[in-house]
């Protein structure tokens, strides 16, 4: 039996491959800090992209983008700040928050899905 973690990892890898096909360079998967986790950290040109991956088997469970609520955005923002601080990225590094939604077999990317949340 496959657990949720294994399913999530599989879709994160699939999302990473999708991002790379669209010019991103994946730096890291599943970066964790005490504040939480970011699914994918990647470079897209000059941008450091913090990417949340959401999967739904079908639309009955709702739109995957809806799962990235304000609370989740705050968590991702805090972890992104910690990542930049601990990996030598300064205040001048352009960053953004993207979301990859997987609905069944369809993958959709929203760049700059949300702004930094305090």
Which functions belong to the PLM regions below?
Residues 1-29:
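Acidic-basic catalytic patches of nuclease active cores, encompassing PD-(D/E)XK
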Residues 19, 76, 97:
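Residue-level signal for inorganic ion chemistry
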Residues 26-28, 50, 97:
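Hydrophobic residues on conserved beta-strands that form the core of alpha/beta folds
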Residues 33-36:
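Short acidic/glycine-enriched loop/turn segments that link adjacent beta-strands
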Residues 38-62, 76:
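Conserved catalytic cores of phosphodiester-cleaving nucleases, focusing on short active-site segments
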Residues 60-92:
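Mid-chain, well-packed structural core segment of small domains
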Residues 85-118:
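Domain-level recognition of nuclease-like catalytic cores that cleave nucleotide substrates
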């Amino acid at each position: 039996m496959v657990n949720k973690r294994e399913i999530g990892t599989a879709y994160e890898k699939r999302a990473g491959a999708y991002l790379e096909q669209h010019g991103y360079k994946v730096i890291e998967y599943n970066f964790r800090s005490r504040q939480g986790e970011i699914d994918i950290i990647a470079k897209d040109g000059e941008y450091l992209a913090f990417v949340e991956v959401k999967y739904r088997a079908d639309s009955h469970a709702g739109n995957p983008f809806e799962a990235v609520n304000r609370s989740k955005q705050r968590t991702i923002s805090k972890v992104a700040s910690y990542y930049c601080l601990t990996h030598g990225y300064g205040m001048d590094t352009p960053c953004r928050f993207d979301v990859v939604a997987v609905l069944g077999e369809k993958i959709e990317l929203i760049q700059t899905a949300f702004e930094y949340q305090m």
